[in-house]
Amino acid sequence: MAVCQICGKKTVFGNTVAHSATTERRTWKPNLRRVRVVLEDGSTKRIYVCAKCLKAGKVKKAV
């Protein structure tokens, strides 16, 4: 579910590293929004889009 349907951005796994070099597992999740979008054929559909794609204008929002 946590995948941008425009660019494919998804959850990334890694470590938080303290000053003492101890590591702790963590995740970074994309800033997803569920948006109603106008498709090429004129129909509307709700899809998950990351905030970066929304700001870049890669999708046309339905009004």
From Swiss-Prot:
**What family does this belong to?**
Belongs to the bacterial ribosomal protein bL28 family.
Q: Which residues form a coiled coil?
A: none
This entry's Gene Ontology molecular function terms read: structural constituent of ribosome
List cellular component terms (GO).
ribonucleoprotein complex; ribosome
Q: Name one Pfam family in it.
A: Ribosomal_L28
Any one Gene Ontology BP term: translation
Q: What is this protein called?
A: Large ribosomal subunit protein bL28
UniProt superkingdom: Bacteria
Question: Record keywords: GTP-binding included?
Answer: no
Question: Does the keyword Transferase feature in the UniProt annotation?
Answer: no
Q: Which UniProt keywords apply?
A: Ribonucleoprotein, Ribosomal protein
